[in-house]
Amino acid sequence: MALRRLLLLLLLSLESLDLLPSVHGARGRAANRTLSAGGAAVGGRRAGGALARGGRELNGTARAPGIPEAGSRRGQPAAAVAAAASAAVTYETCWGYYDVSGQYDKEFECNNSESGYLYCCGTCYYRFCCKKRHEKLDQRQCTNYQSPVWVQTPSTKVVSPGPENKYDPEKDKTNFTVYITCGVIAFVIVAGVFAKVSYDKAHRPPREMNIHRALADILRQQGPIPIAHCERETISAIDTSPKENTPVRSSSKNHYTPVRTAKQTPEKPRMNNILTSATEPYDLSFSRSFQNLAHLPPSYESAVKTNPSKYSSLKRLTDKEADEYYMRRRHLPDLAARGTLPLNVIQMSQQKPLPRERPRRPIRAMSQDRVLSPDRGLPDEFSMPYDRILSDEQLLSTERLHSQDPLLSPERTAFPEQSLSRAISHTDVFVSTPVLDRYRMSKMHSHPSASNNSYATLGQSQTAAKRHAFASRRHNTVEQLHYIPGHHTCYTASKTEVTV
């Protein structure tokens, strides 16, 4: 009996020696598993839970509450320990993890011993309890125990404006952009305007010649002038210059030129004015017209007495027009376009026309002073060849206009010296024009005493052609002059003055 007891004690001692290393090995393995798989937090939680519970195993397997620890088994028989181990029920705990949506699932225990779901099965992102031991999940291989990177939201950190982030107007370049854009637009607009103006000026029709104010007044007073008459007046009013071969108007008022006549007289040369009454036998009425003009008021005289230098530009303008007029062949449409001259073609025929009839001498009643006045000496007999009497066509022909032969008119040697000196003394009137000639003619017809020179009617037939051309030129003579106050009738002191 004593021998059996000794053998049993030896076995129990050997068995207790074998259990102690196994318990220490299990604890070391559990610590290594928690450090490698769950990290410091999960491992600490596992270790703390295992230490707090004290009755569970470190690998997640529960121990029966009635089974004491290995240290308490010392001194117990081996059969009792084996029976207690077989009767104990173990279960697993599923650790906490982050699922596929980034949500954290807490750990849970598979301790449903009645149904047998004691093991943690499934995948790392979806875990559940099962009762098949070979399907349980090795949780140490899973890595979803920490929050994923894509779930972590960036922290909204407010950056305070430092000295480098402050607004500096000198570094702002937006104003320069606006200025440059506006400048380019303005430059394009100005360039377009200048281009438009230049294009209009380049394609503008040529302007008409600016007529001098004095020339415009003269043309306005003359009215519509035939072309032949205009040529006649222009050619008779200008002289050819030997130096520049340009027409130059004679500026001398008293231009004495000897005239070739059929009968040469040794007396003094007569005055040859520019188609004025000096070539007409009406000097008495000429002097009376100046007598009327002598009574003009001071205001009118000051208006008439103008500076001749003002007409220098008019003189040059007339010379230029005359030069261009005879140099251009197609001048008729140009003159007609200006509306100043009608289109009357110059007749260039060289045929001799039929002899013209001399106009009948007007019959005038002699006044009392004419009858009582002493007889005036008649001039010498005037003889003029018939071929020297020119017609209108010959007078207005191109050869006659360009010729240097002066127009012939009968000499007047018995004119009243008083009338001639009085006419010449009036220097405020420059040159007698056809307007004044017609004005003298009207005065002569109204005053028979002006025709006391018997020779005055003899030269009327020779100058009828010239006076006929000048008579149709002026439609208004005295009416176009300035208003002359005062009475203009020349009294003859005759009570029996009758005009037929």
From Swiss-Prot:
Segments on the Cytoplasmic face: 196-500
Subcellular location per the Swiss-Prot or TrEMBL entry: Membrane; Postsynaptic density
Residues with PTM Phosphothreonine: 433, 477
Membrane-topology descriptor: Single-pass type I membrane protein
Cross-referenced Pfam families: Shisa_N
Spans within the Extracellular topological domain: 26-174
Record-level GO cellular component terms: AMPA glutamate receptor complex; asymmetric, glutamatergic, excitatory synapse; dendritic spine membrane; postsynaptic density; postsynaptic density membrane; postsynaptic membrane
Keyword field: Glycoprotein, Membrane, Phosphoprotein, Signal, Synapse, Transmembrane, Transmembrane helix, Wnt signaling pathway
Extent of Polar residues compositional bias: 240-255, 448-464
Signal peptide residue numbers: 1-25
GO biological process: excitatory chemical synaptic transmission; negative regulation of canonical Wnt signaling pathway; postsynaptic neurotransmitter receptor diffusion trapping; regulation of AMPA glutamate receptor clustering; regulation of short-term neuronal synaptic plasticity; spermatogenesis; Wnt signaling pathway
Region named Disordered: 52-73, 240-269, 349-378, 444-470
Tissue spec: Expressed in the developing ventral mesencephalon.
Residues bearing the modification Phosphoserine: 391, 397, 409
GO molecular function: ionotropic glutamate receptor binding; PDZ domain binding
Motif (PDZ-binding): 497-500
Glycosylation sites: 32, 59
Residue ranges of the TM segments: 175-195
The protein's role, per its UniProt record: Involved in maintenance of high-frequency synaptic transmission at hippocampal CA3-CA1 synapses. Regulates AMPA-type glutamate receptor (AMPAR) immobilization at postsynaptic density keeping the channels in an activated state in the presence of glutamate and preventing synaptic depression. May play a role in self-renewal and differentiation of spermatogonial stem cells by inhibiting canonical Wnt signaling pathway.
Record's subunit section: Component of the postsynaptic hippocampal AMPA-type glutamate receptor (AMPAR) complex, at least composed of pore forming AMPAR subunits GRIA1, GRIA2 and GRIA3 and AMPAR auxiliary proteins SHISA6 and SHISA7. Interacts (via PDZ-binding motif) with DLG4/PSD-95 (via PDZ domain); the interaction is direct.
Protein family per UniProt: Belongs to the shisa family.
The record's note on its domains: The PDZ-binding motif interacts with PDZ-domain of scaffolding protein DLG4.
Name of protein: Protein shisa-6
